[in-house]
Amino acid sequence: MTQAPVTAGTPYGTIPPASPLPQRRPVSLPRLAQMREAGEKITMVTAYDATFAAVADAAGVECILVGDSLGMVCQGLHSTVGVSLQDMCYHTASVARGLHRVQGTAWLIADMPYGSYAESREQAMRSACELMQAGAHMVKLEGGGWTAPTVQFLVERGVPVCAHLGLTPQTVHALGGYRVQGKSDEGAATLRRHALELQDAGASMLVLEMVPAQLSRELTAELPHCHTIGIGAGSGTAGQVLVLHDMLGVNLGKMARFVHNFMADAGSVKGAFEAYVHAVKNGSFPDDSKHAW
């Protein structure tokens, strides 16, 4: 008789050698497209290590982003600009190992950090290869229409790409701070043009950060082949993402408007992830009257 794998507790946290959960379908781009067609919201959180990634996966989170936000929440930097490609590969590999050990099904996305793709398409390809070899299923890069040729170059060579518009933290100094983007008619038109260019270039996903809810809703309808993931962009996107530390209330400063502390009413970290998934799926988070502009 085959015995179930034994989970041995250690003083340093426990990740079982094989998942005790029922087998689930691995998340893939076709699976995400099916979810969108069915009207099911996509959930995403950031994670930077094996344990949190495994717990998020067990709670049913579909996508895990190894964000360059690790510079601020893990390394103590004031922005994401100081994060290196080596840093991103290290944390991506850690998350990938955590998911592998529990037979995780989440779709793993890794940020391409500042300075790793702007010089040339060839530089971007080399950087993307390192992240994919570390375990990523997709890479994410920030920037408007100027990144479209790079996106197309990567996609044509088999690298799935998630784009990022609105507030782009890597260029926060050029934007004048952490401000809502696309509020003016001119700003909205520019965002729309860039979003369409990125979809045409082959981007499969698009993070919209701190973009007015109505504009995000309109863009989502206009981008049938590019799944919009909102953070401070209202409830009309195809899915939502939050930074791990924000959604767990691990923050000593003022909470951003678009954040909700899911740990406040949860008995465990896994419970907080489950509450987040449930709230996004049933439409109670985000609440446009509280979490959007």
From Swiss-Prot:
InterPro entries in alphabetical order: Pantoate_hydroxy_MeTrfase, Pyrv/PenolPyrv_kinase-like_dom, Pyrv_kinase-like_dom_sf
GO CC terms of this entry: cytoplasm
Binding-site residues, 3-methyl-2-oxobutanoate: D68, S69, D111, K140
Reactions this protein catalyses: 3-methyl-2-oxobutanoate + (6R)-5,10-methylene-5,6,7,8-tetrahydrofolate + H2O = 2-dehydropantoate + (6S)-5,6,7,8-tetrahydrofolate
Biological process (GO), any one: pantothenate biosynthetic process
Binding site for Mg(2+): D68, D111, E142
Keywords carried by this UniProt record: Cytoplasm, Magnesium, Metal-binding, Pantothenate biosynthesis, Transferase
Task performed by this protein: Catalyzes the reversible reaction in which hydroxymethyl group from 5,10-methylenetetrahydrofolate is transferred onto alpha-ketoisovalerate to form ketopantoate.
Membership in a protein family: Belongs to the PanB family.
Assembly and oligomerization: Homodecamer; pentamer of dimers.
Name the record gives this protein: 3-methyl-2-oxobutanoate hydroxymethyltransferase
